[in-house]
Amino acid sequence: MTTIATATLPENVQRPQYDRSQLRSRIVHFGFGAFHRAHQALLTDRVLNNVGGDWGICEISLFSGDTLMSQLREQDHLFTVLEKGADGNQPIVIGAVHECLNARLDSLAAIIEKFCEPQVAIVSLTITEKGYCIDPATGKLDPTHPRIVHDLENPTLPQSAPGILVEALARRRDRGLPPFTVLSCDNIPDNGHVVKNAVLGMAEKRSPALANWIADNVSFPGTMVDRIVPAATAESLAEIAAVLGVDDPCAISCEPFIQWVVEDHFVAGRPAWETAGVQMTDDVLPWEQMKLRMLNGSHSFLAWLGYLAGHAHVSDCMQDNVFRRAARQLMLDEQAPTLTITGVDLEAYADSLIDRFSNPALKHRTWQIAMDGSQKLPQRMLDGIRVHLERGSRWPLLALGVAGWMRYVSGTDDAGQAIDVRDPLVDKIQQRVAQSDEQQRVDALLGLEEIFGRDLPHNVQFVAGIRAAWQQLATHGAREAVARALNS
């Protein structure tokens, strides 16, 4: 079978310029998803092209991804990233992945032992918010999570990411091996502390001495990641196959823009990521806050309200002047004033985001971005609203964004079509939707403490703002409600 590993590829395809036989699995990565392929794996590949070295990646997937992993092995762990710009496309074959393991194809025992190999210096993760098994209300490990319950009963055969990390670190300690750095690359606020809380929470339940050793020896740097990477579709894979002249089932498309800000605290070394344009810093939080509120907040705004209005893609929203103006106004008038970052031209940043959202080549579906809203609302919108409530400033578009999520999860768009709602809290949400009518819906959903906390449902201004926005959507539909908010 001909694959990208054996085919003669067109000259415009960038290929690894380093000796892949020198790679070792110095990075073990949880979650061989689209974003990781187009972001951390690509940037590590750039480092290898620039300065060489042995910083290979071992990809890990636990309970899914066995087909993808089999396909990756068949093409010598190579895969393609197609950077799609308004002015043309650039195909890049990534060679940084050295090996892969899957619980179904291999075994859980083999995966845990991989973490214990002496050369492993970094364990990185893109497992989404759900994978950390954190209780959103406390920010701590959720001891009632089914996988955490299992892992505490079966510590040497764990099934969760926190359980596997703790068992691997316990074995390394017992064998006299050095610790590794745990690097969350998920798009969640304060991701370093999230994974640290998960790991230490699990370790403390197993052994206070182990928890102390991890706290003293393991680092959990924060990161800010940014690149728009739509999920692969049959159409995007066919487009890449046409560019390459051969199928690549592991390929992914993305925008040309890429950014990675990393707290430079590694206990066992790291690749020279700065040679690939990565910003190594002492403090990631201001960058993360800027991105989550200005980029991700406006992305979710466009996803929920754009979908309700019938826009299938973010670029379709950008073709609609009402949504285009609203996204920029949301960024600059309501999100930017809540930030703590200094030395950044936020107007220029907003303009760059509008350009990126407008990229017609990406076909980033509003339905995809609208998923998992219960996990996204707090950091993308609610934290900014809390700042406005404290200051007494206005937040009409943020209110519309929150109410837009409420209408979206209610399950019907403005044309009366059913919505396929995907969310980890979908059962709780649908129960509250079913038990409330239009007039009660806002209060019913505000009762979800995992999302809104204890403060916001008791804040008179907040509740009034969301009720008013809900009424605008109910009366006028999403597009007209957004247009009215622009002129309010």
Residue ranges and their predicted role:
Residues 1-488:
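Substrate/ligand-engaging "lid" and interaction regions
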